[in-house]
Amino acid sequence: MPSQRSSLMQPIPEETRKTPSAAAEDTRWSRPECQAWTGILLLGTCLLYCARVTMPVCTVAMSQDFGWNKKEAGIVLSSFFWGYCLTQVVGGHLGDRIGGEKVILLSASAWGFITVTTPLLAHLGSGHLAFLTFSRILTGLLQGVYFPALTSLLSQKVQESERAFTYSTVGAGSQVGTLVTGGVGSVLLDQCGWQSVFYFSGGLTLLWAYYVYRYLLNEKDLVLALGFLAQGLPVTKPSKVPWRQLFRKASVWAAICSQLCSACSFFILLSWLPTFFKETFPNSKGWVFNVVPWMLAIPASLFSGFISDRLISQGYRVITVRKFMQVMGLGLSSIFALCLGHTTSFLKAMIFASASIGFQTFNHSGISVNIQDLAPSCAGFLFGVANTAGALAGVVGVCLSGYLIETTGSWTCVFHLVAIISNLGLGTFLVFGKAQRVDLVPTHEDL
């Protein structure tokens, strides 16, 4: 691996022109910079999920206000993924070209504004279902670029030996955001109505975006990137990434399949768990089931990153560690999801839900980092392809779950669906997954 990296970092001929932002992308963060950006991106991921989870948390109250049935609620919940799946590849490509941090800032500013204005859209007229579906599609479009841009950013700025912990730390923001919206959002929901939850999550996102713009990004680089986007010009010289070679590799398709399955199973649980607890245990407190599983998932995510990097530093093969993380993230989590569908005890349901969500965070140190192992020069683009597949599966999975609940009246089939999807992804990755780079060509240039 060191020899491969050194061959990639040979001086580029002077005739190859690069913009200042592209030149900056060729350098790694120093340790203080890495720590600062890790904290900022952790908060950014937290706010991403605050906005994303707002609708699932408010679905029951909004269904009562607007008279939705399960199928209509499923349409609104799944519409997020209709937009989410369309911008994954674009987000990864833009991250590789203009810098992931700039893509993240621009998208956060936009989705924060949409989230704040969602309650206004709901009361524009009698077509509330159409307006809210439209706002969720827009939110999905804007959030779809986040993780591919993040993957591109970390693959360029973070040392390989530190990627798992950095990514799992930033990824823990998904649990923190769900926790914040589940806890604070539940209180706001009870005290101030569902509209206040949207104002809360959207407002915090706009404050975060202002801070990043004001204190962390170079204004000239941001203006330059916007100019390139407006003119449709490439920020860097086109690279010779062997796309045909890339997509002929079984390891690439194994990574895509595993990411698809992990994303789909996670999206189903994320969208329907609040409704499951509300209907199955109507006397339980909303803040309990909206908080506890995600609270326990935070240390689980951090632990997975720590143990992953530790095992690699002790000499274990990279692919062995990645597959072990997927056994935990897809295999073990699916067992607890199955148990969740066969209990009538609130306490046991909380334990099973917490375990299932907690073990799913091990995917951050498994398949999410494996994509960076395979193709660090175009990790954003490749992750975008994989996450597009996951988002498309999420649309089908969330809609299908709503249909199954409505027609069968049972939640058991939903958790069986989660287990089937998870184990399909696990089996594919165990058989075909690898960690060797597949993006190398004789004259390779970083994107």
Curated annotation (Swiss-Prot):
Protein name in UniProt: Voltage-gated purine nucleotide uniporter SLC17A9
GO molecular function: ADP transmembrane transporter activity; ATP transmembrane transporter activity; guanine nucleotide transmembrane transporter activity; purine nucleotide uniporter activity
Cellular component annotations (GO), alphabetically ordered: chromaffin granule membrane; lysosomal membrane; mucin granule; secretory granule; transport vesicle membrane
Stretches for region Disordered: 1-26
BP-aspect Gene Ontology terms: ADP transport; ATP export; ATP transport; guanine nucleotide transmembrane transport; lysosomal protein catabolic process; purine nucleotide import into lysosome
Keyword Transmembrane listed: yes
InterPro entries: MFS (IPR011701), MFS_dom (IPR020846), MFS_Na/Anion_cotransporter (IPR050382), MFS_trans_sf (IPR036259), SLC17A9-like (IPR044777), Sugar_transporter_CS (IPR005829)
